[in-house]
């Protein structure tokens, strides 16, 4: 096993007793480290980028969605999406994006195939690290993220579909959203679309509200179209 790359980490079992091979990796590759050579106690290897240490064990995330033709030409006929310790939202977004990319390729197979822009955009809408193609095209170039151990998180899941009654969409809140917010709706097999939050109501007491800011409470708002029972509603984070 690799000593310290995400999802395959023997350090997890050794350090905290959580076995990566059993889907329980603690992801020590994402922790902050200082290195010290054993014959020089107290003398740290001079590679710290910041006060918290360095991230030399920190791999970027593998992403091959733009290379479907090459994978098919290589004989790949089944794709496994890494999903251990990932959220249901992450799994939904990534599998949906790859499914759409593969369907688009097989509808018009060509070495010059390009993934639709909206599908590529999906890969930026869940928590991830900077992407790399790994070792698929030769020796790894710039495959580690040396400057930070953090994730790219530009979108929040705001709500999950609960019910629809006429023109009222009823949702289970997951992160706060507000009257007037533009939410993007992710449905299975469909290109995402947007809804504007109008006439927001807290279902517990039927009162109008400007903010859905009570965790896991049920809210409703007006919509002008049917929404899939499997829909996930998300909102782009405000830029600082």
Language-model-detected regions and their locations in the chain:
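Active-site pocket-lining/capping segments in soluble small-molecule metabolic enzymes
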Residues: 1-78, 85-159, 166-240
């Amino acid at each position: 096993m690799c000593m310290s790359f995400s999802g395959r980490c023997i350090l997890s079992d050794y350090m905290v007793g959580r076995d990566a091979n059993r889907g329980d990796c603690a992801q020590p590759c994402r922790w902050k480290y200082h290195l010290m050579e054993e014959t020089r106690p107290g003398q740290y290897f001079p590679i710290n980028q910041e006060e918290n240490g360095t991230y030399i064990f920190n791999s970027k995330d593998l992403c091959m969605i733009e290379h479907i033709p090459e994978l098919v030409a290589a004989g790949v006929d089944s794709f496994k999406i890494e999903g251990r310790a990932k959220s249901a939202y992450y799994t939904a977004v990534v599998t949906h994006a790859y499914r759409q990319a593969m369907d688009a390729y097989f509808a018009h197979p060509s070495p010059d195939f390009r993934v639709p822009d909206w599908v590529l955009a999906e890969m930026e809408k869940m928590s991830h690290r900077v992407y790399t193609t790994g070792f698929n095209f030769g020796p790894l170039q710039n495959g580690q993220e040396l400057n930070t151990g953090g994730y790219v998180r530009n979108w929040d899941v705001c709500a999950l579909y609960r019910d629809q009654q006429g023109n009222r969409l009823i949702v289970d809140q997951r992160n706060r959203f507000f009257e007037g917010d533009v939410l993007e709706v992710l449905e299975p097999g469909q290109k995402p679309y947007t809804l504007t939050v109008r006439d927001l109501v807290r279902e517990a007491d039927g009162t109008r509200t400007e903010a859905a800011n009570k965790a896991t409470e049920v809210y409703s708002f007006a919509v002008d179209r049917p929404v899939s029972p499997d829909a996930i509603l998300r909102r782009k984070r405000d830029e600082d």
